[in-house]
Amino acid sequence: MGFKDIAMFNDSLLAKQAWQLLKHLDSLLHKVFKVHFFPNCTFMEAKHLSGGSHAWNSILHGRDVLLMGCRWRIGNGKVVSIWQDHWLLRKNMPQVLSPTVETLVGAKVEILIKEDTRQWDYNLINGMFTPEEVDLIKSIPLSRCEAEDTLFWPFISNVIYISKSGYRFLKSEE
């Protein structure tokens, strides 16, 4: 099959299950896990539970694998954290490296978008980020309508997670 590291292959398969939970909110798997393990939050916010099943804890491990590689596509910016999430379109470091502005520690990307024009607020961006990151942010297209932020898998052309690309990603991270 071409897999040399069975643990890494297993991690890529667990990430596939996490992707299914993330993208298929109407699935029976999502509904059952939602009731039992994350009734008051989203799958992305769910925590490891000491009394959680092995299956649940394994899928959360798969979610962590996904989060290492996934990127956020900016819609309205209401979900994506400026300094913590992977939203910059650069290969090796998709997080913002510019120093955090103390008063904006938990801020979301939405504060960088002008509400009336749905364009980047260049004055704000130029004052908060390094020149390289300013250019990266300005190169991110924004939706004219208020779309939701979505996660995507950037390592294949159709941006949908598949185990093979997950395995390759994990091998490249070694």
What are these language model-derived features?
Residues 1-174:
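A helix-boundary/hinge signal
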